[in-house]
């Protein structure tokens, strides 16, 4: 029984001694806190002399670029604010308190520099969570609260969606001037060690710079962090630019459709409606500003003018296609030479047989010769035969009438075919013309933006 009893005492004695150790640490911290904050006034600057300046070492660490709102010109970020300063009232000798070199206390319990974001857009200028601070035995106070900011940012959407934005965040003390609180930049570069990538934007550069704002005799220091952002254009390229390019080349194919088809105007009108829908989509994205026109807006405007002209040209071509000698004057000689002979060869079209001639002139000589022969024959025929000749002459007149009618119909048919061929030539001309204009316009509009976007990689 004795060994078992001794074993129980030993087991029970171990946690008792450990608890005593824990209690001593807690008691030391409790005594230290009572010592530090006895008579501590958090509303008073912790300096030895009234003319001393508190140097606040300030740094920024970005954890996430949440959103870049071009419409409202806002940038939303999640950051950590690194702040470090010396509080002369919070010093102690670690040997007097069980070797405690640092403690963590609520930030509401001690003096804090009132550093805020000046370009705040949602009214929450402090924006940070009141986390605990680390107080060291030499009086150094380290506070790194997380914060979520919505800052104003002037957007330049000239090269949208291949644009770059330069947004800034300016931090400074709200009430203290430079003689009371001075800001010192910890690191020129923003800490991006734990940065969570954004799917639409990438940060090319993020640097801080100290500045001073003069207000009379007082100087107010501030630190400005500039973020150079570049948009990743893959989404807009696939779902906005490529469809617009397709619609522009679809407009060119309007001139490849035969004029007999009634779908030429329907296709052009459908393309125009589609472009209007794309324009409404872009209007929801970009800010409503009259200073600059975005690149994609210029391109859509160019294509809409392009399609409108194609509709006008198509109406004219269809009008030419349905011309005939019964509704219009005969084709002018220069039109025949240009559109039936010269242009088809230049456009690599099949030769058109020019059968466009006047039927009255072709049959005038045979008719005259027939009447002369008839007169000669009438002198040599008897009276009985004259009756037969008269009958035959009436039959010949009827045949000539039918022949003239058939030739006239054939003549009208040839005129119609000639005008249709002219319409085909016009279609081919405008096909090549619109294709060249479409390709050239697309290259001229997008080349500067692509150069700038690719240059940012170097």
UniProtKB/Swiss-Prot annotation:
One matching Pfam family: Neur_chan_LBD
GO cellular component, one term: presynapse
Subcellular location(s) of the protein: Synaptic cell membrane; Cell membrane
Sugar attachment sites: 51, 138, 166
Transmembrane segments: 238-258, 267-287, 300-320, 429-449
Single GO biological process annotation from the record: signal transduction
Alphabetical UniProt keywords: Cell membrane, Disulfide bond, Glycoprotein, Ion channel, Ion transport, Ligand-gated ion channel, Membrane, Receptor, Signal, Synapse, Transmembrane, Transmembrane helix, Transport
Catalytic activity: Ca(2+)(in) = Ca(2+)(out); K(+)(in) = K(+)(out); Na(+)(in) = Na(+)(out)
Biological role stated in the UniProt entry: Component of neuronal acetylcholine receptors (nAChRs) that function as pentameric, ligand-gated cation channels with high calcium permeability among other activities. nAChRs are excitatory neurotrasnmitter receptors formed by a collection of nAChR subunits known to mediate synaptic transmission in the nervous system and the neuromuscular junction. Each nAchR subunit confers differential attributes to channel properties, including activation, deactivation and desensitization kinetics, pH sensitivity, cation permeability, and binding to allosteric modulators.
Protein name: Neuronal acetylcholine receptor subunit beta-3
Gene source species: Homo sapiens (Human)
Organism classification: Eukaryota, Metazoa, Chordata, Craniata, Vertebrata
Gene this protein is translated from: CHRNB3
